Amino acid sequence: GVPTDVKCRGSPQCIQPCKDAGMRFGKCMNGKCHCTPK
């Protein structure tokens, strides 16, 4: 995935930030959202 600066505690928190970044969905890894490119 693509690392972002969005802090998270769970993967559901990453869905919207990744959409906003033009990507599909994300996982929370090491406290940061990692998004999946389209």
Curated annotation (Swiss-Prot):
One of its GO terms (molecular function) is toxin activity. Blocks the voltage-gated potassium channel Kv1.3/KCNA3 (IC(50)=7.2 nM). Correnti and colleagues have also shown that this toxin inhibits Kv1.1/KCNA1, which is different from Abdel-Mottaleb and colleagues conclusions. InterPro entries: Scorpion_toxin-like_sf, Scorpion_toxinS_K_inh. This is Potassium channel toxin alpha-KTx 3.11. It comes from Odontobuthus doriae. It is found in: Secreted. Has the structural arrangement of an alpha-helix connected to antiparallel beta-sheets by disulfide bonds (CS-alpha/beta). GO terms for cellular component: extracellular region. Expressed by the venom gland. Disulfide bonds join 8-28, 14-33, 18-35. Pfam families: Toxin_2.
